[in-house]
Structures are given as structure tokens and as C-alpha cells.
Amino acid sequence: MKQHTICPLNDILPETGVCALIDGKQIAIFRTKKNDLFAIDNYDPFSQANVLSRGLIGGTTIVNEAGMDEEVLYVASPIYKQRFNLATGQCLDDVDVTLAAYQVMLNKDTVMLQGV
């Protein structure tokens, strides 16, 4: 799989997201306050706009498939506020909607994306 260089880690402030254009596709990349990195599609299917990189990062508890409580991080769309799991792209407010999630990693201090 091809890896894409996105930006230096310091270009993404903690608790924010940025948008990267890769082969004509917009990808939202997020950095948490613990410096974890996540990447999902930037397109919000509810507002039909490429805005998720400007959403707010939050956390909540969900019941997973095993019936256990699980802490998840999400991004809330800046338009209609639907929440998307940062790790999986699953919409927490509509189980029928899932965005693509991508593998994001650090190479030294450079953010890299794989799987687009």
C-alpha cells in the first residue's frame, strides 16, 4: 500500500483536525490531546459538505458488540452535529452510516497516511 506524507506533526494542533487532499479525495486527520492520530473521510453525508476536519473532538461511552461499555473518541460535524467514531468512521447517531477510516502513523515527526 502506498504511503502519503501529510505534514509535520506540529502542523496539527492537539484537539484539532486538518484536511488533506490525496488523489482527489479529502481526508480529515485529527490529533488528540494525547497525540493519538486518526483519519476518516472529510465528507459529511448529512450536510453533503466536506467539513468534518473542522468538527469538534469529544469522547463518550458506547455499548460494543460484546455488550460491554467502551470509551470512544468521536468528531462531531460542525453542521448538524452527528458524531463519527474516529477509529472506525461509524456514525454514533445513525448506525446505517459509516465513513471510511484510514491508517495514520508517525514517521519521526511526520504524519503519514496509508490505505487511500
Located regions from the model:
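Zn-dependent metallo-beta-lactamase
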Residues: 1-22
